[in-house]
Amino acid sequence: MEGSNGFGIDSILSHRAGSPALPKGDPLLGDCRSPLELSPRSESSSDCSSPASPGRDCLETGTPRPGGASGPGLDSHLQPGQLSAPAQSRTVTSSFLIRDILADCKPLAACAPYSSSGQPAAPEPGGRLAAKAAEDFRDKLDKSGSNASSDSEYKVKEEGDREISSSRDSPPVRLKKPRKARTAFTDHQLAQLERSFERQKYLSVQDRMELAASLNLTDTQVKTWYQNRRTKWKRQTAVGLELLAEAGNYSALQRMFPSPYFYPQSLVSNLDPGAALYLYRGPSAPPPALQRPLVPRILIHGLQGASEPPPPLPPLAGVLPRAAQPR
């Protein structure tokens, strides 16, 4: 391999024989020697160890030193790319150990080997530094990504803990029950329910079940209808009592609601003391029924067109007593 490349001992000696004589202590000769000629006792090691020697400057710049001539063999084998490569490697490596300084004095073929394409290869220390910088950058990216992922996981965990704590602290929200659809009763069902309600305002469990079975309804539907109907009946009754109290027809009021009966407090408060006393202390026996209905008699008399007023009705058996006058 050394003979084929032209950098062996024989080739270097043959080039030295063909070149003009150089001074004995010339630093250029000491720099261009092979590592086989170098020894720890040689004085040329001082030339290799000094970074500012003129021989090194001549080799690195590729120009002959003033006062000395370079051989034609060396000029044919030395290229600017080969000479600049050791300088670049030496500038990149900042170590000042003896081992590193002696490594800079290796042969020219080892300093800048030719690539397959004919171009000089990139210096090895620079490539190592670039690869190391890329690896450091990747490590930093991985660390930052892991830190970001851990931070996001920690934030998600904190939000979950806050939601759990807030749900524990806050009272449970009661969901509204879905409103049931109203039952559509038929005319026949409504008529039967109204008849049953006229007979009795409150149904027993057995009567309610029988009525529901006869009308093809559920027990709950019949119960709900009766509750709504009783509410409507009480409201209408309260309005009728107020109208009768305003008109002063206490006898009709007694016929509608025989004693004992629980009258609303609002109705009793609007009545005079005598009427209120009569409502609570009236006769327990029901009053006798009228001999003739009142409304049809008035209507028939109005239809006849008689100018004379209708004859007076016979007096009722139960007459409202007058309030006792204070003496």
From Swiss-Prot:
Methyltransferase as UniProt keyword: no
Region span, Disordered: 1-90, 112-184, 305-327
Positions with biased composition (Polar residues): 79-90
Entry annotated with the keyword Disulfide bond: no
Listed GO biological process terms: midbrain development; negative regulation of outer hair cell apoptotic process; neuron migration; outer hair cell apoptotic process; regulation of transcription by RNA polymerase II; sensory perception of sound
GO MF annotation list: DNA-binding transcription activator activity, RNA polymerase II-specific; DNA-binding transcription factor activity, RNA polymerase II-specific; RNA polymerase II transcription regulatory region sequence-specific DNA binding; sequence-specific double-stranded DNA binding
Primary gene name: BARHL1
Record's GO cellular component terms: chromatin; nucleus
Name of this protein: BarH-like 1 homeobox protein
Main location: nucleus
Database matches in Gene3D superfamilies: Homeodomain-like
CDD domains referenced in this protein's UniProt entry, alphabetically: homeodomain (cd00086)
Organism from which the protein derives: Homo sapiens (Human)
Residue spans binding DNA: 178-237
